């Protein structure tokens, strides 16, 4: 699987449950969000625009995604919100389409346009590595089934304030009877850290 195929598999609406560990404070915070992923082909105006923004030849882009989210975290103050959108564009390396540049309209750790690296690992997980001016982030996304996606991230800020996050994301499906969104049944396999 390449990164564009991963985005195609991610298309749709998701409900995310998140736990963020604030390592400096030795505390964890929970939250949730609703996420929608819309695939964009290489000729989509949003892909052309983000390539232009980052001064990358648009003919090198394989496509990408438009992602929106709306969520909350337990420690939110009244004026805080976790709502937004961003465009991702995939620019694969010519010698290996499973790695390359990931153009973002808005970064994960800082709200600025940024170019990071992506790599598909041996388990078809999508790894994103991004260096910002004041911090760096590593994110990994992977599927355990077609309707269950996992995400982990580590953000290292200069000055030692680090966070680590783990999310489970369940695909939402439209109910045929009354156009309501429902969470599909997910068959889970349980594993022990001890091997039994």
Curated annotation (Swiss-Prot):
Keywords for the protein's UniProt record, in alphabetical order: Lyase
Pfam name, any one: CpeS
EC number of the protein: 4.-.-.-
GO molecular function: lyase activity
Enzyme class: lyase
CDD domains per record: lipocalin_CpcS-CpeS (cd19433)
InterPro entries: Calycin, CpcS/CpeS
Superkingdom per UniProt: Bacteria
Family annotation (HAMAP family): Chrphore_lyase_CpxS
Family statement drawn from the similarity comment of this UniProt entry: Belongs to the CpcS/CpeS biliprotein lyase family.
Function: Covalently attaches a chromophore to Cys residue(s) of phycobiliproteins.
Name by which UniProt lists this protein: Chromophore lyase CpcS/CpeS 2
């Amino acid at each position: 699987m390449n990164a564009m195929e991963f985005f195609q598999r991610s298309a749709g609406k998701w409900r995310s449950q998140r736990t963020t560990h604030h390592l400096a404070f030795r505390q964890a915070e929970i939250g949730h969000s609703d996420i929608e992923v819309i695939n964009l082909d290489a000729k989509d105006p949003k892909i052309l625009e983000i390539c232009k923004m980052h001064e990358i030849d648009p003919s090198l882009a394989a496509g990408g995604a438009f992602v929106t989210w709306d969520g909350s975290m337990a420690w939110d103050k009244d004026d805080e919100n976790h709502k937004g959108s961003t465009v991702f564009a995939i620019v694969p390396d010519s010698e290996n389409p499973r790695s390359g540049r990931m153009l973002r309209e808005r970064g994960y750790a800082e709200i600025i346009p940024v170019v990071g690296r992506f790599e598909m690992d041996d388990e078809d997980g999508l790894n994103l590595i991004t260096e910002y001016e004041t911090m760096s982030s590593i994110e990994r996304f992977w599927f355990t089934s077609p309707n269950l996606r996992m995400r982990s991230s580590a953000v290292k800020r200069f000055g030692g304030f680090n966070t680590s996050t783990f999310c489970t994301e369940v695909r939402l499906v439209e109910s045929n009877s009354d156009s309501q969104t429902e969470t599909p049944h997910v068959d889970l396999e349980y594993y022990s850290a001890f091997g039994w």
